[in-house]
């Protein structure tokens, strides 16, 4: 069966968007690599944004000068960029496999809307657009960091973080109800390459994106307070404590969102929790390296306690997720859409009608026709039948309860 014109249009739009995504991926791979080498057009090494040798938590920010606050050092920034690049490489392979799988699966289209359902299962054009926006914004972020514009870099990274949150939600939920997602998954032919891509490769890519989202939450928290600390007359220690507390609060909203909404679409979404553990290690490294600086400012204990709470909350949230997975497996409540047809057997006997007592005036007028109506009533017989009807049936009225020969 041929696909509908609407499905063909969706597929062509998806292919064109996929080409743009591939081009943007190549550019996002080139920009970080070239930015690490001197004499290639970048004025500064973007990883070395903050000089922790001049870190003083008791000072206030200095005008016309970059005041060092808590941020990623070159090793941590390199790890972050590398992990994001690995996730993008796996996503690149996934979408390439998805395109090949869709080309093969087009020969097995059995409905007018199957092709658009398969495109949405692999990754709709909206998901690809958000992925393109992520790749573009991370390039701009690296270029802005090379020029040491901390205010503009914080704004650009806010756009990148927002695109990452929307993209992660779109990968998990497809911005559709649960029953629509189930129907799209059920339309995929079993034991095909498309089946393997959607049900085995896509969860891996989604968890990698969720892990990168946890790291991006850390960078976003540090970028916000780096910009605030260099914009207003604040103490550096307050900015450090504010960055740690923001990174403590933001994941809590994601934990709640996961249990309330995202878990209905994807049970095994542990990528964010793994990313939070890695981000906690990255955050605690400056506290260990520059312990004397934090101790002299009397912030070592406070910052250490707040940083330690982050992996503890992550562990609690992950245990809740694991318990809910086992509970759902025991209950076995995995809902699927109803079949297209149902078999309905009509009742063999009609429903009893309420008796009506005629008035004396009406009895005289209808006396001439009573004998004929009684004979026609005796000729009526209930009929038992089986009908194959659609899953959505109209309500029957009283006049349709009896079937006349």
From Swiss-Prot:
Q: Which domain of life is it from?
A: Viruses
Q: Where are the transmembrane segments?
A: 18-38, 77-97, 122-142, 150-170, 193-215, 246-266, 268-288, 300-320
Q: Kindly list the places in or outside the cell where this protein is found, as annotated in its UniProt entry.
A: Virion membrane; Host Golgi apparatus, Host trans-Golgi network; Host endosome membrane; Host nucleus inner membrane
- A Pfam family of the record is Herpes_glycop
* Membrane topology per record: Multi-pass membrane protein
- Per the record, ranges on the Virion surface side are 39-76, 143-149, 216-245, 289-299
Instruction: Show the InterPro entries listed in the entry.
Output: Herpes_glycop_M
Main subcellular location of this protein, as a coarse class: virion
Intravirion compartment residues: 1-17, 98-121, 171-192, 267, 321-405
Q: Which GO terms describe its cellular component?
A: host cell endosome membrane; host cell Golgi apparatus; host cell nuclear inner membrane; membrane; viral envelope; virion membrane
Which family does the similarity line name? Belongs to the herpesviridae glycoprotein M family.
Q: How does it assemble?
A: Interacts (via N-terminus) with gN (via N-terminus). The gM-gN heterodimer forms the gCII complex.
Function per UniProt: Envelope glycoprotein important for virion assembly and egress. Plays a role in the correct incorporation of gH-gL into virion membrane. Directs the glycoprotein N (gN) to the host trans-Golgi network.
Name assigned to this protein? Envelope glycoprotein M
**Gene responsible for this protein:** gM
């Amino acid at each position: 069966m041929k696909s509908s014109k609407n499905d063909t249009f969706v597929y062509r739009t998806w292919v064109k968007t996929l080409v743009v995504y591939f081009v943007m991926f190549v550019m996002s791979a080139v920009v970080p690599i070239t930015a690490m080498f001197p004499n290639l057009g970048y004025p500064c090494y973007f990883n070395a944004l903050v000089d922790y040798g001049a870190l003083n938590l008791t000072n206030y920010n200095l005008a016309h000068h970059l005041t060092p606050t808590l941020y990623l050092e070159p090793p941590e920034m390199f790890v972050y960029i590398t992990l994001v690049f690995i996730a993008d490489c796996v996503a690149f392979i996934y979408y390439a496999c998805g395109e090949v799988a869709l080309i093969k699966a087009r020969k097995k289209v059995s409905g007018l809307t199957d092709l658009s359902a398969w495109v949405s299962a692999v990754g709709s054009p909206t998901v690809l657009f958000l992925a393109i926006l992520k790749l573009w914004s991370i390039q701009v972020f690296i270029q802005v960091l090379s020029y040491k514009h901390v205010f503009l870099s914080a704004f650009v990274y806010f756009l990148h973080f927002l695109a990452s949150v929307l993209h992660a939600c779109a990968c998990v939920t497809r911005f559709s109800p649960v029953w629509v997602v189930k129907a799209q998954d059920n339309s995929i032919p079993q034991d095909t390459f498309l089946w393997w891509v959607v049900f085995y490769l896509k969860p891996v890519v989604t968890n990698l994106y969720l892990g990168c989202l946890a790291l991006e939450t850390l960078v976003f928290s540090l970028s916000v307070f780096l910009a605030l600390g260099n914009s207003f007359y604040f103490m550096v220690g307050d900015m450090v404590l504010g960055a740690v507390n923001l990174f403590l609060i933001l994941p809590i909203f994601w934990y709640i969102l996961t249990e309330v909404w995202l878990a209905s679409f994807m049970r095994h979404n542990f990528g964010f929790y793994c990313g939070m553990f890695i981000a906690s290690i990255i955050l605690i490294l400056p506290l260990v390296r520059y312990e004397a600086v934090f101790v002299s400012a009397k912030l070592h204990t406070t910052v250490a306690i707040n940083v330690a709470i982050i992996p503890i909350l992550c562990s609690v949230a992950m245990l809740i997720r694991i318990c809910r997975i086992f509970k759902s497996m025991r209950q076995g409540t995995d809902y699927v859409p109803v079949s297209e047809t149902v078999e309905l057997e009509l009742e063999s006997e009609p429903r009893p009608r309420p008796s009506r007592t005629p008035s004396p005036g009406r009895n005289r007028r209808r006396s001439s026709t009573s004998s004929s109506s009684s004979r026609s009533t005796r000729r009526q017989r209930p009929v038992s039948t089986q009908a194959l009807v659609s899953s959505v049936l109209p309500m029957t009225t009283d006049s349709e309860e009896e079937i006349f020969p």
